[in-house]
Amino acid sequence: MKGMSALCTHHDAELDADALELAIVVPTFNEIESIDVLVSAVQAALEGHNYEIIIVDDDSPDGTADRVREIARRDRRVHCIQRIGRRGLSGAFIEGALATAAPIVAVIDGDMQHDEMLLPAMLKILRTRDLEVVVGSRYLEKGGVGNWTGGRILVSQLATAVTRRVTGVTLSDPMSGFFMIRSEMLRRLAPQLSGIGFKILLDLFITAPSVIRFAELPYRFRARSLGTSKMDAKVALEFVELLLDKAVGHIVPAKFVIFSVVGTLGVVVHLFVLTLVFKEWGFDFESGQIAATLVAMTSNFALNNALTYYDRRLSGWRWINGWFSFALASSIGAIANVGIATYLFSVQETPWLLSAVAGVLVGVVWNYTVTAIFTWRRT
């Protein structure tokens, strides 16, 4: 995956009694309340094994990274990677996995909702069988989802069914964030992974050029007792963006597709408002066009802010400033649209439909590029 950094280490590959067996990667954000408990629980589960715990923190404002460093000063098996300006579980896991010399790497949440006691069984399977991945599944017999509400269970089951149908992945729990993988395979696939959102397991299975050999073990998803949940509508949007990225990301960015869909909806909004103001309310055409443009522009901005750039969402005064930035970029894009289309039709004698499409494409590309840089720039 582009732009990923890694703390590269070297380790004797000879499998002796002192060889590093396993790395546990723990992506965190605001998990200071649970991090001590998690480290102790993993250590108890892996007693007798040679392992390291790599905690990858997305610059948590609650001081999670500082707490991890305090733990690491007393225990050399614990390491901290603090990421600045980058967010997301998938990217954090990839960076952590690339930072270890262990032949096998696992990912586990920092909130104690995954069952760390399953780790030895997962490790044994990978060490004794010709498999590449072992997945902790909530949907096998003896597994479970804890105290989830009926609505959340329904959404999860629907997402699982859609994923299996669309991607062909046969996992019982493709949304699982608890699994173990051979490091060599992860390093081989890393440059092609999207690194979007939470669903790194699904990303791996879609990206792999051949069918992954895997096993699944049941576990019961625990109720969160420490910290606050990160699950919200963003997770669903990340899921959609991941599927789009895997489907068309080699041609155009997934965000460009969403941006274009929003723009198409904007055309519908524009025509609706124009019809309402001009035809129904009896205002002149120019007034109707101005009203329709302002409403459609605001609609596009709001939808892009909520959907396309859910990971950089603006609020408060930044929303207002963003609207002005978006409106300016869109106005210039509209001028470019009209100018290109008119030139092609009038000067180059290009058919009117092709001229119009070319103008629209120029406008959309301009709007997407400029607003991504200035309106929703990464901070």
Residue ranges and their predicted role:
Residues 1-19, 168, 192-275, 301-331, ...:
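Hydrophobic helical membrane-anchoring modules
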Residues 1-44:
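N-proximal low-complexity "stem/linker" segments adjacent to membrane-targeting elements
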Residues 31-34, 60, 115:
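Donor nucleotide-sugar binding loop of glycosyltransferases
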Residues 51-54, 65-99:
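Conserved donor nucleotide-binding strand/loop of the catalytic core
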Residues 57-66, 112:
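A conserved acidic beta->alpha catalytic loop
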Residues 81-99, 104, 116-198, 224-234, ...:
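Acceptor/aglycone-binding surface of glycosyltransferases and processive sugar-polymer synthases
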